[in-house]
Amino acid sequence: MQFSIFTVLAAAASFAVALPVCDATTTATTTSAAANPSPTTSGAANPSPTCGKLGDFHKTTVKAGQTLTTIAERFHSGICDIAWQNKLENPNVIFVGQVLLVPVNVCNPDNTSCLVPVGEATCVTGGPATYTIKSGDTFFAVAQSLGITTDSLTGANPGVVPENLQIDQVINVPVC
């Protein structure tokens, strides 16, 4: 019988079990330094561990300009680790003032499994010609949900400032 790591982690969390993931002498194994940067130490005599244990979290409040990427880097976590822990539907959408529980010092940060591929199409085939903005929407998130590029959505909406979207605002969708 096989279980995913999330099943094991959820079971451990429900029983308040702290499973060691790595110890201070263990180094994270990565396949690509660019995809999974490993934490670095300052060269101090007693460097901090490169990995924490299950249950090591930091509560943080999202500030203006922060993304899951910047938060993950700050706490040596992964974008998808944070998204999973906080049950985020879209890791590209977080809000100023939102409180997140961040797993810290993760041995093998997951920065890819929860990401939806960015659309490459320039128009939606047979789709609706308009879209009504909802709370949390950004041009990036709307374009991603439609499977089109942000540039094509921006091009279909001259005069609309993407940073100033309002709830219930109607924008154009490029239709093929």
Curated annotation (Swiss-Prot):
PROSITE patterns: LYSM (PS51782). InterPro entries: LysM_dom, LysM_dom_sf. It comes from the Eukaryota. It is found in: Secreted. Pfam families: LysM. GO terms for cellular component: extracellular region. The LysM (lysin motif) domains are small globular domains involved in binding chitin in eukaryotes. ELP2 contains 2 LysM domains. Residues 31-45 have a biased composition (Low complexity). Secreted effector that enables the plant pathogenic fungus to manipulate host defenses for successful infection. Binds chitin oligomers and polymer with high affinity and plays a dual role, not only in the suppression of chitin-triggered immune responses, but also in appressorium function. Does not protect fungal hyphae against plant chitinases but suppresses chitin-triggered plant immune responses. Residues 31-50 are annotated as: Disordered. It comes from Colletotrichum higginsianum (strain IMI 349063). Residues 1-18 form the signal peptide. This is Secreted LysM effector ELP2. Its main location: secreted. Glycans are attached at N111. Induction: Expression is induced during the initial intracellular biotrophic phase of infection. Keywords: Glycoprotein, Repeat, Secreted, Signal, Virulence. Belongs to the secreted LysM effector family. Disruption phenotype: Impairs the penetration ability of appressoria in a plant-independent manner. Forms homodimers in a chitin-independent manner through interactions at the N-termini of EPL2 monomers. Homodimers are further polymerized in a chitin-dependent manner. SUPFAM superfamilies: LysM domain (SSF54106). Residues 58-102, 129-173 form the LysM domain. The keyword Repeat applies. In plants, chitin acts as a microbe-associated molecular pattern (MAMP) that is recognized by lysin motif (LysM)-containing plant cell surface-localized pattern recognition receptors (PRRs) that activate a plethora of downstream immune responses.
